[in-house]
Amino acid sequence: MFNLLNTYITSPLDQFEIRTLFGLQSSFIDLSCLNLTTFSLYTIIVLLVITSLYTLTNNNNKIIGSRWLISQEAIYDTIMNMTKGQIGGKNWGLYFPMIFTLFMFIFIANLISMIPYSFALSAHLVFIISLSIVIWLGNTILGLYKHGWVFFSLFVPAGTPLPLVPLLVIIETLSYFARAISLGLRLGSNILAGHLLMVILAGLTFNFMLINLFTLVFGFVPLAMILAIMMLEFAIGIIQGYVWAILTASYLKDAVYLH
């Protein structure tokens, strides 16, 4: 473990490296797609945690639920009310399961990434931006399916003077296409920057405390600051999951109601 800690201190980006934990080899076909990597392992862990939260911590027919159940119901109601407020109408419930699942996946993945020596799924921009592109494509297909060519009226704001229409169409089109990247980039860059900051500060503090006895004692001051930053990262992980859910619901509203 000391070697792993020293590796993270000297090279902070190594914590995001995808390593192969178990792999199959064959002289005839490529079996690399079946390898168990840190990325696939932590994805499985996140899915198992989410499943366990809603299967093992049930009410067992009790009138008053456990604290775990009450906290889960609070999260469920929060996302449900947000979805209803953002999308509105009669069909908001059709999209709620997807939004809630996305929130829980990002929320749990961010919390697990705060465990020392763990792996941050949402810090990998290729994965998280790919997920945002899939959501963007789904919204676009939904809008075209529901409205046909009328969907493109989304790029012309109501009441726009005719001379300004070409300029605003270009701006709105660029803004719409930017959603595909910005949704994932916002989350990935926040998690990536936060984890890098913690590792760099922890490495500096660790090396400082090893100098002599005085620095060992005085080093607890920056160590307390690092713990405060870690608590802030916990909050950012939760907030970023909620922001993802809000923006997904907002983009769905544009696709469904064209406003």
From Swiss-Prot:
Protein location: Mitochondrion inner membrane
Residue positions assigned to the propeptide: 1-10
A GO MF term: proton transmembrane transporter activity
Assigned keywords, A-Z: ATP synthesis, CF(0), Hydrogen ion transport, Ion transport, Membrane, Mitochondrion, Mitochondrion inner membrane, Transmembrane, Transmembrane helix, Transport
Effect the entry attributes to changing residue 241 to S: In strain: D273-10B/A1
Listed transmembrane segments: 36-56, 92-112, 125-145, 150-170, 191-211, 216-236
GO BP terms in the entry: proton motive force-driven ATP synthesis
GO CC terms in record: mitochondrial inner membrane; mitochondrion; proton-transporting ATP synthase complex
InterPro entries the record matches: ATP_synth_F0_asu, ATP_synth_F0_asu_AS, ATP_synth_F0_asu_bact/mt, F0_ATP_A_sf
Membrane topology listed for this record: Multi-pass membrane protein
Assembly: F-type ATPases have 2 components, CF(1) - the catalytic core - and CF(0) - the membrane proton channel. In yeast, the dimeric form of ATP synthase consists of 17 polypeptides: alpha, beta, gamma, delta, epsilon, 4 (B), 5 (OSCP), 6 (A), 8, 9 (C), d, E (Tim11), f, g, h, i/j and k.
Function description: Mitochondrial membrane ATP synthase (F(1)F(0) ATP synthase or Complex V) produces ATP from ADP in the presence of a proton gradient across the membrane which is generated by electron transport complexes of the respiratory chain. F-type ATPases consist of two structural domains, F(1) - containing the extramembraneous catalytic core and F(0) - containing the membrane proton channel, linked together by a central stalk and a peripheral stalk. During catalysis, ATP synthesis in the catalytic domain of F(1) is coupled via a rotary mechanism of the central stalk subunits to proton translocation.
Protein name (Swiss-Prot/TrEMBL): ATP synthase subunit a
This protein's encoding gene: ATP6
